[in-house]
Amino acid sequence: MKSELEKLVGRYRELGIGRQLDYDKFYLYSIITHSTAIEGSTITELENQIMFDNGIALKGKSLVEQNMNLDLKAAYERALVFAREHADVTVERLKELSALTMKNTGSEYHTALGDFSSANGDIRLVNVTAGVGGRSYMAFNKVPQKLKEFCDTLNALRRKHSSMSMQELYEMSFDAHYNLVTIHPWADGNGRMARLLMNWLQFEFGLIPSRIFSDDKEEYIKALVATRESEDLGLFRRFMTDTMITHLNRDISSYLESIGEDAPVEQPKEKVKTRDRIIELLRENPKHTTRTLAEEIGITPKGVERHLAILKSEGVLNRIGPDKGGEWQVVEVS
């Protein structure tokens, strides 16, 4: 039985959306634009089209932003070659793509263990954290071996592609995305590289490539953090699948509207924010625990604890009684 994503991809292809003039080029430009937007770029798809196709510098946009997009385009063009050749994913190829991605925006680092440059795709020689107060990523001295093991495992899976369903192929690419950003091999550019690797695999196996829009950024980061804390890849797979379903529905609707047809496409249900879901559940049952809330919502207990702390600080929730045996009170605002 086909998954919802597989059915939607079938509908997308049935309509011939991917057979439109210059579709591949413009879709690639869209991928690049949204990947750099996640990192702070304000350049639009139309502006990238002008810059990429005509070599025109963009007024009002910083040189860093423009180089970020131009460099990522060069990296994607190289990844497309690897995809067409069914080349193995290797440490050297990942370093090559990282060097292209960071060519004009990377930095040099000087450490007690030696110098390295993110502009050259060098593996980091320093430890890094996920923001101030965040958890540290893997120790730098473990990265080379872990990255090699990651490539070997991924290549073993790639060789089984003929026995995998479309949904399984997508999940392999989503897992690769998550695992690479978790290893965090470079001092900078890990997010762009993880999304690029995901797309490389999708291009290789003839899938419609995934995009993560800037509007998805908050939930994207939350999904990465929750997956890392729970060690449950299912969380990130569900986020990526749901996000892709939303984008495909939107693309199909836009296409049908553009050719003057009604769009018989079921619109995605609006996602309920985690904090709103917590409030709703506590109204129904004030005796919910952190664990039962986590099970109901599908996030980690630590994630629930963070939301509860924020809601308490905002005066939305009160705790009545002890942690064990007490209950929650939702403060109704008149």
Q: Can you name each region flagged by the protein language model?
A:
Residues 1-188, 192-334:
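FIC/Doc superfamily catalytic core
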